């Protein structure tokens, strides 16, 4: 498909053709040694009621009446970020941190050794997240780009490779180390960190991430796993692709989520919960 929405569509269809999710429980907390969280004083900390738009394809429509936009970090122009800021909106930088995408301008920076199995969509492969010496500088450069364009936060996509047939023997502990690294690096740049999916590690990652974003937790009856973010007073943004509003909005309101319905293409169209 040649755009960032590929990863979102893979999630929507559940088990991707070449990369079906597998059970891979995380290691016990006592077995992990994680670095301390890096504070992000003054960073964007949205209210749980924040309204939002998620557009990863097409020319950004800046006229949607919401408080936050989540848009592609590479393709969105700095002028668009400025325009949204001038309208009083926060702007989140979408990056795929766990997959290689052949159309990205830095695609040649990824050596063959870190590119694993296809994730089921043309031009994408899982990354060997254990190799921070290789991936770290690339991801830092991407976050530098987000900061230079004026974004307020980073949405890290595909950060649950340990639960998929990635082509590497990734463990839950590997994923935790990588995700913590990403969040801390975002905070070093004054960017809030948005955790995408990875429901199985929420309790461990809560000290590091400022916001949660989830796809289809109502469809798969997984939304209760996001309660730690709610209890901490942090925003939880959720999207459903197949359910009608009446099938999830009452529960979303009860849980304190900011939820909406989107089409798989992740273009302008949105249907928010009332």
Residue ranges and their predicted role:
Residues 20-32:
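Polybasic, low-complexity, intrinsically disordered segments
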Residues 1-23:
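Secretory targeting and sorting signals
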Residues 29-274:
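Glycan-processing catalytic domains of CAZymes
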């Amino acid at each position: 498909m040649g755009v960032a929405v590929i990863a979102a569509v893979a999630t929507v269809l559940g088990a991707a053709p070449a990369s079906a999710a597998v059970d891979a429980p995380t290691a016990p907390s006592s077995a992990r040694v994680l670095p301390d969280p890096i504070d992000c004083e003054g960073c964007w900390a949205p209210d749980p009621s924040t309204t939002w738009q998620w557009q990863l394809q097409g020319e950004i429509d800046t006229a949607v009446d919401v408080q936050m936009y989540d848009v592609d970090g590479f393709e969105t122009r700095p002028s668009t970020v400025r325009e949204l800021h001038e309208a009083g909106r926060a702007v989140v930088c979408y990056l795929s941190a766990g997959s290689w995408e052949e159309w990205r301008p830095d695609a040649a920076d990824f050596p063959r050794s870190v590119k694993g199995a296809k994730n089921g969509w043309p031009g994408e492969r899982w990354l060997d997240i254990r190799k921070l010496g290789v991936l770290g500088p690339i991801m830092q450069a991407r976050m530098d780009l987000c900061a230079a364009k004026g974004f307020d936060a980073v949405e890290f996509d595909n950060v649950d490779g340990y639960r998929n047939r990635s082509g590497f023997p990734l463990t839950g502990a590997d994923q935790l180390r990588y995700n913590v690294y990403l969040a801390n690096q975002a905070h070093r740049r004054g960017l809030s960190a948005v955790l995408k999916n990875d429901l199985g590690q929420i309790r461990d990652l809560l000290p590091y991430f400022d916001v949660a974003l989830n796809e289809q937790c109502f469809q798969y009856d997984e939304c209760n796993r996001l309660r730690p973010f709610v209890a901490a007073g942090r925003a939880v943004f959720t999207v459903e692709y197949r359910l009608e509003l009446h099938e999830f909005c009452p529960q979303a309101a009860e849980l304190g989520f900011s939820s909406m319905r989107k089409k798989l293409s992740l273009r302008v169209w949105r249907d928010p919960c009332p």
